[in-house]
Amino acid sequence: MTRAEMPRIERMLLAVIEAVPVWHPAHATFEPFPVFGWVVHHPDGPIVVDTGVGIGNSAIDGWYQPRVTPLADALDALGVDPGDVAAVVLSHLHFDHCGQQAALACPVHVQVTEWSAAQTEHYTVPEWADIRGERLRLVEGDAEVTPGVRIVATPGHTPGHQSVVVEGGDRRVVLAGQCVFLSLIHI
């Protein structure tokens, strides 16, 4: 793949939240809420966008009843070694998007405004959003992760929500995180 080509992008189903059903118009019924992450297969190394629900928090387990796929298993299913992941971009720090970031040793990109919001009580599961030392890459606004992959600030769902734009050739894909929520039929 040359720099000009579009990297392959694959979706990971990281959890299904049983206690928060969403309407599925094609089936005319409520269905469990899926939690997705993404892998951008970039020549500089895989980039993970969102890491799903964490494992082992009794409050989250009791309230939301998630069926969680360990991030390492989801990556393995796509042929990605967790040790090869070059970067993580978290769309935001709610529990269902940042929960398994600690399973990876690479840099984690988060908006400064999101990081600040996550330090307040009841914003997230603190231990799941705890990113320490050199791994934490605070971003102010738009930024490049690596050539052809950039972060775009998309506040709204949270103060520091961010999306990822992947470009290659004449194509552009936006991994919107949760700045746009469509029904299950569109996911």
Residue ranges and their predicted role:
Residues 51-54, 93, 113-114, 157-158, ...:
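Active-site metal-binding loops of divalent metal-dependent hydrolases
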Residues 186-187:
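Conserved small/polar residues in nucleotide/adenosyl-binding loops
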Residues 13-73, 77, 163-177:
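Conserved beta-strand hairpin/beta-sheet module of binuclear metal-dependent hydrolase folds
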Residues 4-9, 42-46, 143-151, 168-173:
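Beta-strand-turn-beta hairpins that frame and shape the catalytic cleft
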Residues 152-162:
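Active-site glycine- and acidic-residue-rich loops that bind
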Residues 99-104:
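Metal-dependent catalytic neighborhoods of phosphoester/phosphodiester hydrolases
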Residues 67-96, 110-153:
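Metallo-beta-lactamase
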